[in-house]
């Protein structure tokens, strides 16, 4: 009888010990996972340290190069539309992104005489409409974001809203759970 009681109590102790240990581990990781925001001085110091790395040096060279200046100038021409989230008229120049790009699905568009990469993050249901785009289609784009990278010779516009012939063909779906 004692052996049966011990056989029942021993697994109960082992399981309760494991549960207690896992709850302690969860508490420790939750305390560590919330870093405090950096102050302006700390942020500037981190930026200076990064600028001294090989990647930072290459980035600064790119910014000062004619290619970097061209990208910044193209960004400046659409900055008001980006900030105000207003319509930008463009013409699709290519359905393919530059060779070696890792941006996912996108197209090349000419807006006000400058070329841009328009990047999309479509749901599977939205891909069919985006695949219906053709070269020389006139589209209207709205975006909240424009970015750049030394790897690309064009600014990268995140396509939040696209319409063709007064019909919406893409509207970015907000992510679940916030941002």
Label each residue range with its predicted role.
Residues 87-92, 136-144:
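OB-fold and OB-like beta-barrel modules that bind single-stranded nucleic acids
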């Amino acid at each position: 009888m004692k052996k049966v009681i011990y056989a029942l109590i021993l697994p109960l102790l082992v399981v309760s010990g494991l549960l207690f240990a896992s709850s302690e581990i969860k508490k420790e990781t939750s305390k560590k996972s919330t870093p405090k925001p950096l102050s302006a001085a700390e942020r500037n110091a981190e930026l200076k340290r990064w600028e001294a790395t090989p990647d930072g040096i290459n980035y600064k060279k790119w910014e000062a190069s004619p290619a970097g200046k061209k990208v910044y100038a193209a960004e400046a021409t659409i900055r008001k539309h980006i900030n105000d989230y207003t319509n930008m008229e463009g013409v699709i120049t290519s359905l393919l992104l530059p060779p070696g790009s890792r941006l996912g699905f996108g197209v090349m568009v000419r807006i006000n005489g400058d070329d841009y990469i328009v990047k999309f993050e479509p749901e599977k249901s939205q891909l069919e409409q985006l695949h219906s785009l053709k070269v020389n289609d006139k589209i209207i784009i709205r975006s909240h974001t424009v970015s750049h990278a030394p790897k690309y010779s064009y600014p990268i516009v995140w396509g939040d809203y696209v319409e063709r012939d007064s019909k919406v063909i893409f509207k970015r779906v907000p992510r679940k759970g916030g941002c």
